[in-house]
Structures are given as structure tokens and as C-alpha cells.
Curated annotation (Swiss-Prot):
It comes from the Eukaryota. Keywords: Amidation, Antimicrobial, Antiviral protein, Secreted, Signal. The modification Leucine amide is found at L34. Shows a low ability to inhibit hepatitis C virus (HCV) infection in Huh7.5.1 cells. It is found in: Secreted. Residues 1-23 form the signal peptide. Expressed by the venom gland. It comes from Chaerilus tricostatus (Scorpion). Antimicrobial peptide. One of its GO terms (cellular component) is extracellular region. Belongs to the non-disulfide-bridged peptide (NDBP) superfamily. Short antimicrobial peptide (group 4) family. This is Peptide Ctri9819.
Amino acid sequence: MKTVSTVAILAIFLLIVITTIETNRILPTLIGPLGRRSKLETFKRIARTLSAGISAKRSLEDVNSLTGMSS
């Protein structure tokens, strides 16, 4: 559970950093296509990635509990 909250905090921090960089219009020159996305699209992409990561972690925990291994 601690890892999930750490990942959530990191995702929020990254969102703030990306928003700040996009606001300053540095991102389009550094990354190109990513800079053409709106902030909402960028946020949705980060949220989907985070959600997939949390789902994968839960699946791993389920498998580990079934096999008797600790994570």
C-alpha cells in the first residue's frame, strides 16, 4: 500500500512539472508530438499509465498471495 501512495505522489509531482514546462512552451521543442497535446490529454495519459501500474501491482500481489511468495 505504501508503494501505491508513493507512486501517486510521484505522479502528481510529475503532472505539476509537465504542466509547468508546457506552460513555458519548452516541452514542444524538446519532445515534439507530446507538446501538441492539450494539458487534459497529457493528464489523461498519465492517469491511464498510473492506473495500469496500480492494476499490475495488485495482480502481482494476488499471484504472490496465491503462490505464498512475499513481494
